[in-house]
Each structure stands twice: as structure tokens, then as C-alpha cells.
């Protein structure tokens, strides 16, 4: 119920924001355009935003005959979580990453990249998939897909502000825009930052919650902790062709290494996430090397984690 209220609040806030920006850019004509745009975006956000995101990344649905191990892990973890079996998609990119989308647990999708399947062992893959199913269980997925669509709308308005500054606003008359030429250029610069802030308002805490819930679904935190360590090591080496508006949907930031993306990161630090899973203190020199931990330390860390959940 809490996340349903958040979804309504997000839709309301974004509608108001689009109307204000439209009015500032193009006066009455701009506000009318923004109103039409907001109504359309609200409708499509609920019914089609998941399909748009999947199409954006050219993700392909797979069945047990095409990806038996992947499908089997998702099936087992879904049963552990008490969730309906989601659809399973593979993204044709070598950068290791994953996300979940959909409007509710009955219409959920889990998508992983080819790079993730190549990089992770079975336990680590289960940890990643459990994290994504945790987003489904916690009903984060609708908020995430709405935020992606709305952030894209803000980016579109930024582009309109830029061209409006060049050609004189929506109606071709400088008087239509309360901002004027300089103001519209400023809007074109600030709107992408606004898009990043929208993603951040989804709250980084949902990643911590998904990590904890995912560890419970998987049965232990070790697989996810090791997977996050690997993702941290490889995310900078293999760039992902990702849209900034969807960055918050992935298990790790797909825009790693880009200074502006880091400044407005939609994810908490990986070393902190790993530390919470393992019960260790985050290392100041970087993410703990999870795969290099001894078996005894891993068992002790897992015990600390489960004790903290009691």
C-alpha cells in the first residue's frame, strides 16, 4: 500500500512539474502542451512503460528451452518469495547488469544482460535474480518504470527548451515565454539535472531493502555480495549503452565512470551495500573483494547478517 501511495504522489508531482516547466518555457501554449503531454505520460507510464524499457534495450523473452538454467533459477526463487513466475528477458549487451520492471507482481519482468550470464556463477546469478525479485515483492517496479518514463519526459522538455531559446519559444514569440532567451537556456541545462533528481527521489534505500530481501529469498547473502563485488569490478571496464532516464532501474549504475552520473548517482555505494550484506565495515580503499573472502569469514558474515534481521 505504501508504494501505491508513492506511485500516486510521484505521478501528481511530475504532472505539476511538467505543467510548471511548460508554462515557463512557452507560456499558455507551453502549459497546454505540457498538460496534454502529462496526461499521455501518466497513461502510458502505467500501462506501457515496462514495454518501452524492454524495447529500448532490445530485450528478448526466453523460455525454458532457450535458457534452462536461468529460467529454473528464476522459477525456484519466485517460489521461495511467494511470487508468480515473472517473464524472463535477456538483453543483448556484454556489460553485466540486470533490472526488473512491470506494473505489479502479476505482470512482472526480470531482465539480465548476456554479460551478466557470462560473468556470474550459479550462486552469484541467483543472488542477482533474488535482488530483482525483491523489487517485485516490495512493489518497487511500478515506481521505477514510472520514474524512467517521467525522467525521459523531463529530458524531452530540456531539448524543447534549447530549441525554444533558439527559435523563440513554442509559439515563435518571445513574449510567450516568461523566461526569455537566457532563462530557456538555463532551463535546458537544469532540466537533465532535474531528471536525475527525480530518479534519486525514488530513494536509494530501496536498493538496501532489495539487497536484504533478496538475500532472504536466495537463502543467504553470500551470492549477492560476491555478485556486487564482481559488478563493481567490471562495470567500469565494460561500458553499457544505457539511457540515463532508466539508470535507477538496474542493480548497479550502468553509467559508472561518467562524472555527472556519479555526482547524481541513483544507487548507494557498492562497498556500503556489500558491507551491509556481509556484516563488515566498508573499506575506504574500495569495495571489499567478496570473491576473495575465506569460507569461514563468509559463514561468519552470513550469520551476522541474519542476526541483524531478527
Curated annotation (Swiss-Prot):
Biological process (GO), any one: proteolysis
UniProt KW keywords: Cell inner membrane, Cell membrane, Hydrolase, Membrane, Metal-binding, Metalloprotease, Protease, Transmembrane, Transmembrane helix, Zinc
Primary location: membrane
Record bears the keyword Ribonucleoprotein: no
GO molecular function, one term: zinc ion binding
Segments passing through the bilayer: 7-27, 29-49, 141-161, 178-198
Active site per UniProt: 132
Compartments (UniProt record): Cell inner membrane
Any one cellular-component term (Gene Ontology): plasma membrane
Enzyme Commission number(s) of this protein: 3.4.24.-
Top-level taxon: Bacteria
Cofactor note: Binds 1 zinc ion per subunit.
Extent of Basic and acidic residues compositional bias: 293-310
UniProt cofactor(s): Zn(2+)
Membrane topology summary: Multi-pass membrane protein
List of residues binding Zn(2+): 131, 135, 207
Region annotation (Disordered) ranges: 277-310
Pfam families: Peptidase_M48
Matches recorded under NCBIfam families: PRK03001.1 (NF002826)
Entry's family note: Belongs to the peptidase M48B family.
UniProt protein name: Protease HtpX homolog
Phylogenetic classification of the source organism: Bacteria, Pseudomonadati, Thermodesulfobacteriota, Desulfobacteria, Desulfobacterales
Amino acid at each position: 500500500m505504501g508504494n501505491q501511495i508513492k506511485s500516486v504522489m510521484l505521478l501528481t508531482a511530475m504532472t505539476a512539474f511538467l505543467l510548471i516547466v511548460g508554462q515557463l518555457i512557452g507560456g499558455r501554449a507551453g502549459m497546454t502542451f505540457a498538460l496534454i503531454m502529462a496526461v499521455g505520460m501518466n497513461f502510458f507510464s502505467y500501462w506501457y512503460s515496462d514495454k518501452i524499457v524492454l524495447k529500448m534495450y532490445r530485450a528478448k523473452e526466453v523460455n525454458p528451452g532457450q535458457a534452462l538454467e536461468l529460467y529454473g533459477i528464476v522459477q525456484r526463487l519466485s517460489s521461495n518469495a511467494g511470487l508468480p513466475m515473472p517473464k524472463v528477458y535477456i538483453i543483448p549487451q556484454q556489460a553485466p547488469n540486470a533490472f526488473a520492471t512491470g506494473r505489479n507482481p502479476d505482470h512482472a519482468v526480470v531482465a539480465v544482460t548476456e554479460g551478466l550470464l557470462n560473468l556470474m556463477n550459479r550462486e552469484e546469478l541467483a543472488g542477482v535474480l533474488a535482488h530483482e525479485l525483491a523489487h517485485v515483492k516490495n512493489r518497487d517496479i511500478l515506481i521505477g518504470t514510472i520514474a524512467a518514463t517521467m525522467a525521459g519526459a523531463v529530458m524531452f522538455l530540456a531539448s524543447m527548451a534549447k530549441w525554444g531559446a533558439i527559435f523563440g519559444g513554442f509559439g515563435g514569440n518571445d513574449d510567450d515565454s516568461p523566461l526569455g532567451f537566457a532563462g530557456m537556456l538555463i532551463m535546458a541545462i537544469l532540466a537533465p539535472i532535474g531528471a536525475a533528481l527525480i530518479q534519486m527521489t525514488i530513494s536509494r534505500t530501496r536498493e538496501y531493502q532489495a539487497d536484504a530481501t533478496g538475500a532472504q529469498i536466495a537463502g543467504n547473502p553470500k551470492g549477492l555480495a560476491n555478485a556486487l563485488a564482481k559488478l563493481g569490478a567490471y562495470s567500469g571496464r565494460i561500458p553499457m549503452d544505457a539511457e540515463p532516464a532508466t539508470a535507477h532501474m538496474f542493480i548497479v549504475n550502468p553509467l559508472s565512470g561518467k562524472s555527472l552520473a556519479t555526482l547524481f548517482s541513483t544507487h548507494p555505494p557498492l562497498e556500503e551495500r556489500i558491507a551491509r550484506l556481509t556484516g563488515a565495515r566498508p573499506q575506504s580503499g574500495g569495495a571489499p573483494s567478496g570473491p576473495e573472502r575465506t569460507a569461514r569469514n563468509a559463514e561468519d558474515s552470513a550469520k551476522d547478517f541474519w542476526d541483524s534481521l531478527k
